[in-house]
């Protein structure tokens, strides 16, 4: 099949959230399965320093009364063609840049549509989040081009009806209430990034006021769990951690813990229960819940706690003050550093993800990959990847709690801390987590099926397409 990914982000060179990981990884796996996969994204001002981009464009287009250029390069580490839409609107040195976002990304979506009509015609356009939401509307009258729309985060829905009509000149009845709603209405297939999240967003609690529409289109709505790049995130070969190891050589992992304790200014002690937390410091990630019980948990136990992330100033201040109250036991780094995050995955005993909601979640998968036992709230993709440890039957790969309540999180942390004291059992728990297949392979096969459904292609002739 000929598949064009259209997205605002692509890892590793233009990433803000999980969408970038998907767009940077899934096309490579689909390419290996024999499909002609290409990526279309904005030519941001910072990309020249990260990619080898030719000076001359391959094509000139016209959209929304503006000319634009398209440049061709390749996705790093692959032979997947990468098309960059060049226009002064994308020159700012950041992906999301303020009040003109609605116009910029609607223009980008229109440019992708023009590119597909006039330069390279795919069978399927795979659209990602609200930035590309108008593409299914414009492609609705193109019988030879189908669309698949992926919801990465329903909370961000794009410009609403009054502004969208002004930007696009499309009548309101073609738009829905936002670009997200327009995509849900007109895309041939819609999916989220985990099966559980696909069910949850059809309820008022998680539906962000679109639960009625999502229930209405449930026949074309599905959930496909994200994967991770298991070659890049491999504790046996990762050059950014102190000691390499695998699930059969877990004894070597201790060197990473001791090095992390030293790097973070903690007491260097192999017997301390070390918990890692890497996330944006916002309410979605459960930071408000954590702050209600962390002081009590640290005073009750001898555990250590490390935080890496940035976010809302109030949460940053609270975490910083807690770290000053527990020197040698808690460390807070208000920044993001990819190398340090990997060292936290490799050196922590457990990894906390207490999210209020989580479409998929990548950090718990990385924790499993590196042998850090995840402690999570059962929501979204966390339900599909982390299963509660049952010591009676040697089952599960982490610790889970259900209600978004301080007592539930506190109880779960205490249970994990107590279990850590029984090292033979804990190491088996780590090994079960490291044995989970977290690659993109199964997800890519599911996307193949989704594309086939979108274009009406029988699955038995999929490989011949």
Swiss-Prot record:
InterPro entries: Glyco_trans_1 (IPR001296), GS/SS (IPR011835), Starch_synth_cat_dom (IPR013534). GO terms for molecular function: alpha-1,4-glucan glucosyltransferase (ADP-glucose donor) activity; alpha-1,4-glucan glucosyltransferase (UDP-glucose donor) activity. Keywords: Glycogen biosynthesis, Glycosyltransferase, Transferase. CDD domains: GT5_Glycogen_synthase_DULL1-like. Its EC number is 2.4.1.21. ADP-alpha-D-glucose binds at residue 15. Synthesizes alpha-1,4-glucan chains using ADP-glucose. This is Glycogen synthase. The gene is glgA.
């Amino acid at each position: 099949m000929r598949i064009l990914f259209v997205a605002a982000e692509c890892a590793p060179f233009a990433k803000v959230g999980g969408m970038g990981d998907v767009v940077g990884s899934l096309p490579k796996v689909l390419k290996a399965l024999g499909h002609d996969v290409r990526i279309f994204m904005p030519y941001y001002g910072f990309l020249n320093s990260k990619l080898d981009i030719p000076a001359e464009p391959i094509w000139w287009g016209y959209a929304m009364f503006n000319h634009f250029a398209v440049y061709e390069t390749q996705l790093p580490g692959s032979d997947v063609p990468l098309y960059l839409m060049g226009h002064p609107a994308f020159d700012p040195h950041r992906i999301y840049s303020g009040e003109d976002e609605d116009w910029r990304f609607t223009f980008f979506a229109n440019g992708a549509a023009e590119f597909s009509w006039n330069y390279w015609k795919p069978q399927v356009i795979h659209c990602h989040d609200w930035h590309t939401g108008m593409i299914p509307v414009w492609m609705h009258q193109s019988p030879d081009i189908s669309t698949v729309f992926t919801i990465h985060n329903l909370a961000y829905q794009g410009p609403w009806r009054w502004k969208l009509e002004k930007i696009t000149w499309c009548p309101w009845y073609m738009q829905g209430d936002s670009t997200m709603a327009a995509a849900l209405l007109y895309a041939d297939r819609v999916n989220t990034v985990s099966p559980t999240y696909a069910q949850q967003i059809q309820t008022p609690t998680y539906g962000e006021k679109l639960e009625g529409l999502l229930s209405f289109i449930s026949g074309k709505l599905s959930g496909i769990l994200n994967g991770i790049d298991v070659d890049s995130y491999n504790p046996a070969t990762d050059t950014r951690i102190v000691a390499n190891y695998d699930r059969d050589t877990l004894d070597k992992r201790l060197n990473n813990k001791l090095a992390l304790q030293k790097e973070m200014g903690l007491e260097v002690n192999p017997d301390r229960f070390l918990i890692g937390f890497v996330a944006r410091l916002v309410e979605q990630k459960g930071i408000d819940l954590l702050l209600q019980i962390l002081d009590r948990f640290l005073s009750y136990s001898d555990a250590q706690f490390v935080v890496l992330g940035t976010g809302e100033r109030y949460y940053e201040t609270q975490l910083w003050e807690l770290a000053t109250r527990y020197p040698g036991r808690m460390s807070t780094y208000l920044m993001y550093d990819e190398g340090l995050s990997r060292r936290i995955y490799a050196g922590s005993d457990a990894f906390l993800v207490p999210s209020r909601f989580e479409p998929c979640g990548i950090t718990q998968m990385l924790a499993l990959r590196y042998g850090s036992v995840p402690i999570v709230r059962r929501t979204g993709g966390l339900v599909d990847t982390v299963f509660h440890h049952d010591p009676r039957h040697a089952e599960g790969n982490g610790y889970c709690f259900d209600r978004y309540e301080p007592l539930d999180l506190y109880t779960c942390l205490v249970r994990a801390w107590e279990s850590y004291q029984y090292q033979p059992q804990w190491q088996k728990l780590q090994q079960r987590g490291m044995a989970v297949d977290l690659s993109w392979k199964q997800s890519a096969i599911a996307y193949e099926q989704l594309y086939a459904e979108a274009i009406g292609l029988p699955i038995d002739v999929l490989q011949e397409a």
